[in-house]
């Protein structure tokens, strides 16, 4: 069959033809055609199973299904089973690769799972095995030698200290957007000129006395970079509600859910500590909305890098 399912209208037509045949011939048909007039058909046993699953669905959900599978779909294969090791030796990996290739050659298709050891036992899904092969080939290309081991699933990268320390103060976050939300709820702004506070001290002051835009940029840049984003500090002038221009610093961030890294830096997403803590503006908006002038990148004569 070209498809493993039929829509509900086709199934009910099959059911009607099955009942008509039984009534007319006093027996069940050996096969049931998918469509009236001939063509593709299924055995009686398969059709009975379709009827059973159709009735089960109606009893359970109080409505008809939109489709009925000819044969029930196979359950999803877990990525790894509970006994699967964290990694395999290069010898073991190459044995898995050999068995995978042999299966393809013999059966004309890929296996649903690849066993870690010949003869059964722990296994990985086809998708996981393909990822193992991709990482093996990348290592080979980059290092011009085979790895000693291949991880079944890649290990989590170590969390940078700056991210760990920020999570200790603000709580859990995984993205720059989530971090911005936490900053808007927990942190404070304090006006003063230039950068005056080392990062370790600023980490404490941001939730007590408050810090300014310069110290905030120096504090949050390595944190957001540690989450996997590209970050630059932009030096600007902003015009506020009093129509005066003020010097200001904020972050431009790209990657993941924010602006694309392929865009020029001046089009990356604005991540402004003062917007979050003082003026209550959303992520992507600078603290003042009456005007903005770009002055440069990075902090002028920083005291605390």
UniProtKB/Swiss-Prot annotation:
EC number: 3.4.22.-
List of catalytic residues: 213, 248, 272
EC category: hydrolase
GO molecular function annotation: peptidase activity
Database matches in InterPro entries: Peptidase_C71, Pseudomurein-binding_repeat
Keywords: Antimicrobial, Bacteriolytic enzyme, Cytolysis, Host cell lysis by virus, Hydrolase, Protease, Viral release from host cell
Cofactor binding remark: Activated by Ca(2+).
Cofactors: Ca(2+)
Pfam assignment, any one: Peptidase_C71
Region (Pseudomurein-binding repeat): 3-34, 39-70, 87-116, 121-152
Thermal dependence: Optimum temperature is 71 degrees Celsius.
GO annotation terms (biological process): defense response to bacterium; killing of cells of another organism; proteolysis
This protein's record includes keyword Lyase: no
pH dependence text: Optimum pH is 6.4.
Domain notes: The N-terminus contains a cell wall binding domain. The endoisopeptidase domain is at the C-terminus.
Family in the record: Belongs to the Psimunavirus Pseudomurein endoisopeptidase family.
Subunit architecture: Monomer.
Misc: PsiM2 is a defective prophage of methanothermobacter marbuggensis.
Function: Cysteine protease that cleaves the cell wall of its host methanogen under hydrogen limitation of the latter (autolysis). Cleaves the epsilon-Ala-Lys isopeptide bond in the oligopeptides of pseudomurein.
Protein name: Pseudomurein endoisopeptidase
Organism field: Methanobacterium phage psiM2
Taxonomic lineage: Viruses, Duplodnaviria, Heunggongvirae, Uroviricota, Caudoviricetes
Name of encoding gene: peiP
């Amino acid at each position: 069959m070209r498809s493993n399912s039929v829509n509900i209208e086709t199934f009910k037509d099959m059911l009607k033809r099955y009942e008509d045949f039984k009534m007319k011939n006093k027996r069940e048909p050996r096969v049931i055609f998918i469509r009236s007039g001939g063509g593709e058909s299924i055995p009686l046993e398969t059709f009975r199973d379709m009827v059973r699953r159709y009735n089960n669905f109606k009893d359970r959900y109080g409505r008809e299904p939109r489709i009925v599978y000819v044969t029930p779909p196979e359950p999803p294969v877990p990525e790894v089973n509970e006994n699967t090791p964290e990694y395999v030796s290069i010898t073991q990996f190459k044995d898995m690769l050999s068995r995978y290739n042999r299966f393809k050659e013999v059966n004309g298709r890929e296996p649903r799972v690849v066993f870690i050891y010949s003869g059964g036992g722990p296994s990985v899904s086809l998708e996981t095995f393909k990822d193992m092969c991709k990482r093996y080939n990348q290592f080979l290309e980059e290092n011009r030698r085979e790895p000693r081991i291949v991880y079944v699933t890649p290990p989590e990268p170590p969390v940078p200290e700056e991210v760990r320390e920020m999570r200790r103060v603000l709580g859990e976050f995984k993205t720059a957007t989530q971090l911005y939300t936490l900053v808007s709820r927990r942190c404070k702004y304090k006006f003063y000129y230039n950068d005056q506070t080392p990062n370790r001290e600023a980490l404490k002051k941001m939730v007590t006395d408050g810090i300014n835009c310069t110290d905030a940029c120096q504090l949050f840049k390595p944190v957001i970079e540690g989450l996997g984003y590209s970050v630059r500090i932009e030096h600007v002038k902003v015009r506020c509600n009093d129509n005066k221009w003020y010097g200001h610093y904020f972050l431009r961030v790209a990657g993941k859910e924010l602006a694309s890294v392929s865009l020029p830096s001046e089009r990356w997403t604005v991540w402004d500590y003062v917007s979050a803590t003082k003026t209550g503006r959303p992520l992507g908006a600078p603290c003042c909305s009456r005007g903005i002038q770009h002055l440069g990148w990075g902090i002028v004569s920083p005291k605390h890098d």
